[in-house]
Swiss-Prot record:
Gene3D superfamilies linked: Cytochrome-c3 Hydrogenase, chain B
Protein name: NADH-quinone oxidoreductase subunit D
Cellular component, GO, one term: plasma membrane
Cited function: NDH-1 shuttles electrons from NADH, via FMN and iron-sulfur (Fe-S) centers, to quinones in the respiratory chain. The immediate electron acceptor for the enzyme in this species is believed to be ubiquinone. Couples the redox reaction to proton translocation (for every two electrons transferred, four hydrogen ions are translocated across the cytoplasmic membrane), and thus conserves the redox energy in a proton gradient.
UniProt membrane topology term: Peripheral membrane protein
Top-level taxon of origin: Bacteria
Gene name of the record: nuoD
Lineage, highest ranks first: Bacteria, Pseudomonadati, Campylobacterota, Epsilonproteobacteria, Campylobacterales
UniProt key word Transcription regulation: no
Keywords, sorted A to Z: Cell inner membrane, Cell membrane, Membrane, NAD, Quinone, Translocase, Transport, Ubiquinone
Gene Ontology MF annotations: NAD binding; NADH:ubiquinone reductase (non-electrogenic) activity; quinone binding
Family that this chain belongs to: Belongs to the complex I 49 kDa subunit family.
Subcellular location: Cell inner membrane
Catalysed reactions listed for this entry: a quinone + NADH + 5 H(+)(in) = a quinol + NAD(+) + 4 H(+)(out)
Record note on quaternary structure: NDH-1 is composed of 14 different subunits. Subunits NuoB, C, D, E, F, and G constitute the peripheral sector of the complex.
Amino acid sequence: MAQNFTKLNPQFENIIFEHDDNQMILNFGPQHPSSHGQLRLILELEGEKIIKATPEIGYLHRGCEKLGENMTYNEYMPTTDRLDYTSSTSNNYAYAYAVETLLNLEIPRRAQVIRTILLELNRMISHIFFISVHALDVGAMSVFLYAFKTREYGLDLMEDYCGARLTHNAIRIGGVPLDLPPNWLEGLKKFLGEMRECKKLIQGLLDKNRIWRMRLENVGVVTQKMAQSWGMSGIMLRGTGIAYDIRKEEPYELYKELDFDVPVGNYGDSYDRYCLYMLEIDESIRIIEQLIPMYAKTDTPIMAQNPHYISAPKEDIMTQNYALMQHFVLVAQGMRPPIGEVYAPTESPKGELGFFIHSEGEPYPHRLKIRAPSFYHIGALSDILVGQYLADAVTVIGSTNAVFGEVDR
């Protein structure tokens, strides 16, 4: 006998589920441990199989885009840390890159080297974090412990550079706030060795593990057509066999000068995505090893030189009246970019992260829009989960590597 179910949430009041006695409606989250209180999935089940999935988001909404329209360009930078909080440096850079494109700033080479090192270090930290918590979701707890130990070394490096372990705020509009500390590169080289050893250890635990492969292979399959229609990017897209990486297609900073590969998958399933995260760690190590000798050959400033938009060096501010006055105006009133609009895409650890900024020549954006990859990947769950078993839902959600700080903006 058919029954109708109408959800009480106004957002879903028009969604009516019609099913027979063999079907069931299940609310997955937001209380479920794997959804971390940030995702609700309305699942329609036929036995153990999912026949319909409706994601509900908004549990972490903080109005980040609207905040950007009420802050000066420099004031907004710390807010970007709170988007994808597992890779905050990537958020800092994506925002700074958009503003710099709007201002047509030329970034000193030394700052470019430091930025690219930080971005790839941040990518490795984010990837090893994903692998560890994804393995924990599936039940491989020992992987979580080994990976987190190595991740701590990377966070120590970020703390040595910028003073923060999670919300780094390590990028500035026009460059970077600090040069690399003494002996920092030696610590970085040591970390690269630790990361290699950790990666080998994890692969030894997982790659030939029958349970791990059974839980991931042919689970959460994404086709090329599905990936393109949902606007997927990053590893979710490359897992289907499409070799699209913004660092290659629209290179920024020093990526045009660097030699690295873009790994792609064959089947688009959860196991392919896991393998790509592991392979990308190798590529990040390879990139950083090319950047370390580049750093020694640079001696330019670490901030762009433009008195209309960028403060003078601190030693000048402390000793010269003109520099002090210029700094006061930039801090008190904010910079005034030219009228125009820009969209600047970057390749974050999750995929394409870009900021659209529309300027009316005021000290704050007239419109700020964030293109975050996790938003599209969570939306695609309504397609990916159909046909999957309920027991595999956690695996599929985890394999998207979505962070809800950038989903709910």
